[in-house]
Every structure is written in C-alpha cells, then in structure tokens.
Amino acid sequence: MASIEAALAEIKRGVEELIPEEELIAKLKEGRPLRIKLGADPTAPDIHLGHTVIFNKLRLFQELGHEVTFLIGDFTAMVGDPTGKNTTRPPLSREDVLRNAETYKEQVFKILDPAKTKIQFNSEWLSELGAEGMIRLAANQTVARMLERDDFKKRYAGGQPIAIHEFMYPLLQGWDSVAMETDVELGGTDQKFNLLMGRELQKSHGQKPQVVLMMPLLVGLDGEKKMSKSAGNYIGISEAPSEMFGKIMSISDDLMWSYYELLSFRPLEEIEQFKADVQAGKNPRDIKVLLAKEIIARFHSEADADAAEQEFVNRFAKNQIPDEMPEFDFDAGTPVANLLKDAGLCASTSEAMRMVKQGAAKVEGEKVADAKFAPEAGTYVFQVGKRKFARITIK
C-alpha cells in the first residue's frame, strides 16, 4: 500500500468534503484494507460521465489496496430516493430494478476492476428486517431531524406531501453501513444527509463511524445544471466515440478545467501546465482534444479516440471554422430559426427558414433539416453560408 501521505493526497484530489479527515488518517494508519462502499439505486440503466466521478475515486481505493463494495440498492430503489425531489419519487418494480442492475454491472466494470470489486444487494439484509426491525430502525430518528433535510423542509413549507416511507429512505441507506461495517462511504454532495445518517446509526450500534467522502456533482454540457439524462446535458459512457468527442469539444473553455480535475487521470502538475500554456496563448481547443481522447480511450480504445479526432477534424477543420466568432446564450427549447435570427446570422425568421430549406444552415458542421428543431443543452457552432458563424450556448 502507498504511504499514508501519498495515499491521502490522491484520495483528496477533487473531493468536495471529507468528514472527518482526521478519522480517515487514523483508519489508514491501522495498516489494514479499509471497507469502502459506494451505493447506487438502479433507477436508470445508463451511466454517464457524471456518475464516473465517484466511480473513478472508487477505482483509486482499489488501486490503493482497499476492499471495495459496489452496493446495488435493489431494496431502496423500490422505496425511491427523495433526494433533490420536490415530489414523491415513484418506486420501481422488482423486475425494473433487476434489469437495470444488470446493465449497471456491465457498465461499472468499464471503470472498476472486476477482480477487486464485491457486488452486493441491500435486499440481503433489508428484506430480513421485517415489521419489528423497521419499527426499531425508525425509532433511531425523529420527524424533526428528518425535516432538517433541505428537500423535505422545502416540501413541508410549501405544503407538498411527504410520504412516510420517504422518511425511511435515509435510515435504510444508513443501515446498509451498519450491516456492512463500512469504514468509508462515497457519495455525491447531494447525498450528505443520507451519508451522515450512516455515521449516526453506526455510533448508536457500537461501531466506529464511517468516514464520509463526498465528490462534487459534475456540471453538464450546458455549463449550469448537474449532468443528468433528464436535463439532456449528459455524455453517456456507452455512446459512440464520435458522439462523445463532439460533446466534449462543445463544453466551454472554463468548464473544461473542471472536467480535467474530476474526469482526467493526468497528474495535477500536468493540468496546471496546460493552464499555463493556455494563458501563454495556446489554443484551448488543443487541450480539449487531449481530454476528449483520454476519456474515449478509457471507455472504448485509443484507436477509437484517434478515429473520433480525425472525424472531428474532417467535419470542422476542413470547413475552415474561425477561432473567433460572436457568442450568445439562449434558453433551451428555442427553435433553430429563432436562434439564427437572434444571433444575427439571418435578418428574419423567414430568411432563416429559407436558409434551412436551401441547406445553407449548419449546426456543428451538419446541415439543419428542420427549422423548428430545438437543440438540447450545450455549446454549438452555428453557420449560415460560408462566412457567417456564431457560437451559441443553449441553457
């Protein structure tokens, strides 16, 4: 195992919050493999780059010699995690959960080492609780404590219903940590309440409390909201290489650095050198290409990454797209015809519709087929004719 100082530095890279750091240091000094847990409810079958921020950290713990468990919340998925929701989340059927879980396992092994990953389902112990066990578990917390959760607080203040079973969710997730005697649990910053519940339940059941390590939420292609399928601002890890390349190249130059910190495996010193190069005048597009190729090679292959870059060059560089062009921000749902007019590429929407019909309007080098088409969140190069360009961000 790596030295404690070196291991701690790697573990803390990109971490939003570590509760508490001194307890993690103490656990590392014990010189034994720590029990590391990451839980996920298989509510959707596709994993995107936002999910990989935490999986990358889990992979690091594997490389450092610790015991990693990917916990599939098949039981809790049937309850429905209320985190971040202003309405009750509909529970999934057992069939949906198991089908999604199989897809999850296939995808996470693109990141985690299968030989070093233990897969568990929390139904193993939660199904055994029974009515008496559920009542005993519920007795560990009060309604007042549950209403400290931001989402519950807002719903209660707004007169929105909160189902009793939703109060159980943090307790059930916390009980996972008791059942597994977890040393460290990973999660996103939106899971803080649930993660701390695990610490509380472990303390009350005579266990050493787990360390909570929270990773930031990856901002999506729009540069504003967290990456999610529902927001349409995501990059799926199973997407075609050319699709991934184009999406990564569409992010803003500022957002690129966040992606480097959270998604790249390059040394921090190298990333800092990239920043210095850009400040010295290097085109940030060249740095973004390196990021795109690194990510594509990870989930596909280096050959696929090279091919995706070449396709991108063929589509865009040969069209002689200028580096400098007007930039605009527009709301999602705006049709192409309106975007072309409001960005000054066409004098009117009628002209914009005519340009589309004539095949003279392009988005990211592709001819627009429908003037009513509204692009999803992201940053795109719009072109009319050979010389009119605008970089438009859809939010």
From Swiss-Prot:
Its main location: cytoplasm. One of its GO terms (molecular function) is ATP binding. Residues 334-394 form the S4 RNA-binding domain. It is found in: Cytoplasm. InterPro entries: aa-tRNA-synth_I_CS, aa-tRNA-synth_Ic, Rossmann-like_a/b/a_fold, S4_RNA-bd_sf, Tyr-tRNA-ligase, Tyr-tRNA-ligase_bac-type, Tyr-tRNA-ligase_bac_2. ATP binds at residue 229. Catalyzes the attachment of tyrosine to tRNA(Tyr) in a two-step reaction: tyrosine is first activated by ATP to form Tyr-AMP and then transferred to the acceptor end of tRNA(Tyr). Its EC number is 6.1.1.1. HAMAP family: Tyr_tRNA_synth_type2. It comes from the Bacteria. Coiled coil: none annotated. Belongs to the class-I aminoacyl-tRNA synthetase family. TyrS type 2 subfamily. CDD domains: S4, TyrRS_core. The keyword Repeat does not apply. This is Tyrosine--tRNA ligase 2. GO terms for biological process: tyrosyl-tRNA aminoacylation. It comes from Vibrio parahaemolyticus serotype O3:K6 (strain RIMD 2210633). It catalyses: tRNA(Tyr) + L-tyrosine + ATP = L-tyrosyl-tRNA(Tyr) + AMP + diphosphate + H(+). Homodimer. It holds the Pfam family tRNA-synt_1b. The keyword Aminoacyl-tRNA synthetase applies. It is an enzyme of class 6 (ligase). Transmembrane segments: none annotated. A motif ('KMSKS' region) lies at residues 226-230. One of its GO terms (cellular component) is cytosol. A motif ('HIGH' region) lies at residues 42-51. Keywords: Aminoacyl-tRNA synthetase, ATP-binding, Cytoplasm, Ligase, Nucleotide-binding, Protein biosynthesis, RNA-binding.
